[in-house]
Regions:
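Rossmann-like dinucleotide/flavin-binding elements
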Residues: 1, 10-14, 18-44, 161-206, ...
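Beta1-alpha1 glycine-rich phosphate/pyrophosphate-binding loop at the start
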Residues: 14-17, 21-99, 183-212, 279-280, ...
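Glycine-rich beta-alpha-beta "Rossmann" dinucleotide-binding loop(s) and their flanking helix/strand
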Residues: 134, 138-163, 248-286, 313
Length: 338
């Protein structure tokens, strides 16, 4: 009692340490295993935490084959896999493959150089230090939602993540956003018994909304089941509702709850603090997804900054393959570093 927690150090150095056990991080670990490299994955949540955080009744836009990893088939009951099916799939793949994953272990910093990285992490027992020859960051973006940046956004009735409709039954809910997450949440809330208003700054929701959701949403608006307030920018949030700026002037929208779903941006703290060079809001990357710090790679969403619409599990898998192929060649001494 009273003594500071000590930093526990893992003695063995691994060839590859992967930060993040989402689909792309797991894919990187699978490639490490296939290529004969020792690996360790550190994840601050559970395996496939990103998928776990999706709305409970969400259906993927991609077909099952496009989000499979490691050659393991994903069997879905419908034409598209559900959140639950994908979550169980990724966790079972990690289990069957015997991937070395430490969950509920948050990475705090990455230091060092190619061949001798030190990764500091924290679990419930305190801080731990890990050694690795190469580091692959696959932290994704779902834990870093975009914010409105307006007064009142931190009030307790304002949410930046949507799970399910049950807590909002019979209440006035304003959903802010115009893409998949917002439209899907609005429909789910309506069917769960909430009184829903969707607020969006554009003239209409984005045409990229999932093709099976868009006509459903349009029909609910036409029949008056969901109210759509377009060309509206949120100025402030109060305990009673939202102040909106519209072409016709300032307007107040009463709401018991406000769900802000305006997209996400890649988590970049680890990369920036490790000294990675950025081009605008995206890290500089080689064709093998190596950053400006030799031996430190970034794959999946974390390589795209705010442009999260350009990366999916499907192309993130290719990032992981390219990065691990390059790492394996260097570990074996087959290819000199450019």
């Amino acid at each position: 009692r009273g003594r500071p927690a000590r930093c526990r150090k893992l003695r063995a150095m691994v060839d590859v340490l992967v930060v993040g056990a989402g689909p792309v991080g797991l894919c990187a670990a699978l490639w490490a295993k296939r290529l004969g490299l020792s690996h360790l994955v550190l994840e601050r949540g559970t395996v496939a935490e990103t998928v776990y955080r999706f709305p409970r009744d969400m259906v993927f836009f991609s077909e099952a084959k496009n989000i499979e990893i490691g050659g393991h088939p994903l069997v879905a009951q419908g034409p598209k896999p559900t959140r639950k099916e994908a979550l169980l799939y990724y966790q079972r793949v990690a289990e069957r493959e015997g991937l070395n994953v430490l969950t509920y272990t948050e990475v705090l910093s990455i230091r060092g150089r190619e061949g001798a990285f030190q990764v500091l992490a924290k679990d419930r027992k305190g801080e731990r230090a890990f050694s690795a020859r190469y580091v692959v960051v696959a932290t994704g973006y779902f834990g870093n939602p975009n914010r409105l940046g307006v007064p009142g956004e931190d009030l307790p009735h304002v949410l930046h993540r949507y799970e399910e409709a049950a807590p909002f039954f019979g209440r006035e809910v304003a959903v802010v956003g115009g893409s998949n997450s917002a439209v899907e949440a609005a429909l789910d809330l309506y069917r769960g018994g909430a009184k829903v208003t969707l607020v969006h700054r554009g003239k209409w929701v984005r045409p990229s909304v999932k093709y099976w959701l868009l006509p459903d949403f349009e029909n609910r608006v036409k029949e008056g089941s969901i109210r759509a307030v377009m060309e509206a920018r949120v100025e402030a949030i109060t305990p009673e509702g939202l102040w909106l700026s519209r072409p016709s002037g300032r307007e107040f929208l009463p709401a018991d709850f406000v769900v802000v779903l305006i997209g996400y941006r890649a988590e970049d703290r680890l990369l920036r603090e490790a000294g990675v060079a950025y081009e605008g809001e995206r890290p500089w990357l080689s064709p093998e997804w190596e950053t400006s710090v030799p031996g430190l790679f970034a794959v999946g969403s974390c390589a795209y900054g705010p442009d999260t619409r350009s990366v999916f599990i499907e192309n993130g898998r290719e990032h992981a393959r390219a990065a691990l192929t390059a790492i394996a060649a260097r570990v074996r001494g087959l290819t000199p570093r450019p």
